[in-house]
């Protein structure tokens, strides 16, 4: 039976305010009962000065009052331990509600939320484990920051999915959980950046052409053609392999593999939606060429999917690699959001691939990702998400959109200034598709627009054709995020690269300092020095010049 009840609570902002007020009352009681000391108060204020909502941060952090404040690892660990059961409760609420809902899109949104809560809980548990077992090394410091940033992204994504088509009852059911979890995720990030500042040597050295997080074996694989790779599993439509479909192959991949599992997909068009779940780790999906091995689907928001669930291929198992494959969503521009590839796997490499769709083509959802030597086509927001992601040597190709639409290559989704996420486009080429080029004066295209308040995107050392409007960037909604975003351009070329007519927003920057540009390179934005080298993909750690 479809659930359709009147509003039980006020709208989201009202709910958010009530939670904050309630937490403040509790925190005041805690301070009185524990004899809150001046040093504790000072540290709490220092931490919460880093948060976008100081009052809610102070309320949250009062939970760990009385601990040895000098033991920074234990303070953050204790706070995260108190967060875990709350994430579990949100998971149970979403999962239980999904069983009682008849509306397919609402059910999908709730199942998305359940998956996202499960992923968040795993990351929080992993973070607690690091804090419990070891002093922070350069690598574990990087991991913690990336994972805690991803937890916040998961919570926001759940809320976004509910906004796409859920009833007020379903939104109300989940909002109280999600608003608190978002506040907690922001607070954990504030604790982290205050108590564990990045060390000056946080970027590990690069050996040879590869960051150290890419194993020697993976380096060899990424430099090898698919036909020359010795696979563990072969998928072939003609029956000559181990399986005829990708989904059969995914089911056969061992869970939580410590070694690389290679799945070779032979030439053919595979019409299926494929999900590499959290336990499908260290998978390498390799085809026989981006024009020969094609995985295609057509899920879309208009026909009842959520943006998150519309992906033709989704991967959330860490260490995912894809090479020599085309990922496609054929829904068309009239179907609006329709994702070809969604990645929520840490330390992902996408090499020599083609990714084709229209709106929301590629969804680098969260964590560290690297894309090299690939073609991506789309219309509106066709690279969107909140990963720490670098694109190198890629072709980014706006295509002909529907009348009344404007092409935007990026829509970056950073929601908190303490998240270490952002999109970097380096040494790429931006030009119109064959169908757009004759009419590009009629259909405008831009480098990006700010999806979320702290959106962060840099285009550097790239070729920009005249397909890009002289303004360069587009507003999302009037003056939303124009002061808090960070959009930058550095040493680009081509007829569309001139900056004299660019937007005059406070958050837009023409970068002249190499030191600033370096922050958006492989070595710094995605800590490539600690993991990319082992994958074998070619990359440039710093600036090209």
From Swiss-Prot:
Q: Which residues are glycosylated?
A: 135, 375
Q: Which CDD domains match?
A: PMEI-like_4
Q: Does the keyword Cell wall biogenesis/degradation apply?
A: yes
Query: What residues form the catalytic site here?
Result: 360, 381
User: Can the keyword Hydrolase be found in this entry's annotation?
Assistant: yes
Q: Which PROSITE patterns match?
A: PECTINESTERASE_2 (PS00503)
Q: Which family does it belong to?
A: In the N-terminal section; belongs to the PMEI family. In the C-terminal section; belongs to the pectinesterase family.
Q: What does this protein do?
A: Acts in the modification of cell walls via demethylesterification of cell wall pectin.
| PTM statement from Swiss-Prot or TrEMBL | N-glycosylated.
CC annotations in GO: extracellular region
Residue span of region Pectinesterase inhibitor: 38-191
Pfam families, alphabetized: Pectinesterase, PMEI
Residues annotated as site: Transition state stabilizer: 359
Q: Where is the signal peptide?
A: 1-37
Instruction: Provide the protein's localization.
Output: Secreted, Cell wall
Provide the GO biological process annotations.
cell wall modification; pectin catabolic process
Name a GO molecular-function annotation: enzyme inhibitor activity
Region: Pectinesterase; residue ranges are 232-530
* Functional pathway: Glycan metabolism; pectin degradation; 2-dehydro-3-deoxy-D-gluconate from pectin: step 1/5
Binding residues annotated for substrate, in chain numbering: 307, 337, 449, 451
Q: Which reaction does it catalyse?
A: [(1->4)-alpha-D-galacturonosyl methyl ester](n) + n H2O = [(1->4)-alpha-D-galacturonosyl](n) + n methanol + n H(+)
Enumerate the NCBIfam families for this protein.
PME_inhib
UniProt name for this protein: Pectinesterase/pectinesterase inhibitor
Which UniProt keyword terms apply here? Aspartyl esterase, Cell wall, Cell wall biogenesis/degradation, Disulfide bond, Glycoprotein, Hydrolase, Secreted, Signal
InterPro entries, sorted: Invertase/methylesterase_inhib (IPR035513), Pectin_lyas_fold (IPR012334), Pectin_lyase_fold/virulence (IPR011050), Pectinesterase_Asp_AS (IPR033131), Pectinesterase_cat (IPR000070), Pectinesterase_inhib_dom (IPR006501)
